[in-house]
Amino acid sequence: MTDLKKAAQRGIELMDLTTLNDDDTDQKVIDLCHKAKSPAGNTAAICIYPRFIPIARKTLNELDCEDIKIATVTNFPHGNDDIAIAVLETRAAVAYGADEVDVVFPYRALMDGNETVGFEMVKACKEECGDDAILKVIIESGVLKDPALIRKASELAIDAGADFIKTSTGKVPVNATLEAAEIMLTVISEKNRNVGFKPAGGVRDAAQTAEFLDLAARILGDDWVTPQTFRFGASSLLNSLLHTLELVDAPKPTSGY
C-alpha cells in the first residue's frame, strides 16, 4: 500500500483512540471523544479506564457518535495471574457499559511454563462479557519476545474464546512489531479467521500504518481488514494520520502510546 493517504484514512477508521494515563481526568476523556470525531471521520473506538466509561458514553451521545465503541482495560497493565480479580474487573467494566474489554493475558505465568492460568482467565473473562461486550486479549508480545511464546499465547487466547488478540499494553519498552504481528496473524489464519488483531503502541505514522495493513492483507486478505477484525491501538497516531491527509498541521514529537 504505497498510497499513504489511503493508509491514513483506513488507519483512522480502524483506530481505538486511547488514553490510559495515570493523570487522566473527565475533561481529558471528553477531549478524547471530541478527537475521535475527527475531520476524516470517526475512529472505530476509544479506549479508556473503566471509571471514565459513563462520561465517555454521555459525551459520545451528545456528539451524535453512538457508533464509536467504548473499549476499556482489565488486569492492566501487569497481566497478573489472579483469575478472580481479572473476572471482577471485567464484570465491572461490562456493568459500566463497555462495548469492548481489553484484558491482559498473564504473560509472565506463561513465561514460567504455566499455560493453564492464561487459558482459564480468558475463558472466564469471555463468560463475563457474554453477548454484551467483545473481549480483546493483550499478550504483551514485546515482553514474551520468543516467537514460540507469542504463538502459544495467541493460540491459548483464541482457544479460550478471545474475539481479538492484541500485541501490547503500551506500557513496556517494546510494543507492536511487524515480527510479532506476523506470528499472531498467522495463528488467526490457522485457527479462526473470525478473531481480530490489534497492534497497539509503537505505530507512529502513515508509513507504519501501511506496513501493518499490508501484512494483514497478505496473510488474511484485504477484505478481512475491517473494524470487525482489525484495530490500531494508539493515541498520538491520529494527529499524524490527519497531517498526512492535510487536515491538521504537523504533529509535535511525542513519546506516547
UniProtKB/Swiss-Prot annotation:
Lineage: Bacteria, Pseudomonadati, Pseudomonadota, Gammaproteobacteria, Alteromonadales
Catalytic residues (UniProt): 102, 166, 198
Gene Ontology terms: cellular component: cytoplasm
GO MF: deoxyribose-phosphate aldolase activity
EC number per UniProt: 4.1.2.4
NCBIfam families, sorted: deoC
Family of this protein: Belongs to the DeoC/FbaB aldolase family. DeoC type 2 subfamily.
Cited function: Catalyzes a reversible aldol reaction between acetaldehyde and D-glyceraldehyde 3-phosphate to generate 2-deoxy-D-ribose 5-phosphate.
Matching InterPro entries: Aldolase_TIM, DeoC, DeoC/FbaB/LacD_aldolase, DeoC_typeII
SMART domains: DeoC
Superkingdom assignment: Bacteria
Main location: cytoplasm
Keywords: Cytoplasm, Lyase, Schiff base
Stretches of the chain forming a coiled coil according to its record: none
Identification of the protein by name: Deoxyribose-phosphate aldolase
Keyword Transport: no
Pathway: Carbohydrate degradation; 2-deoxy-D-ribose 1-phosphate degradation; D-glyceraldehyde 3-phosphate and acetaldehyde from 2-deoxy-alpha-D-ribose 1-phosphate: step 2/2
Reactions this protein catalyses: 2-deoxy-D-ribose 5-phosphate = D-glyceraldehyde 3-phosphate + acetaldehyde
Pfam families, alphabetized: DeoC (PF01791)
Example GO biological process: deoxyribonucleotide catabolic process
Subcellular location: Cytoplasm
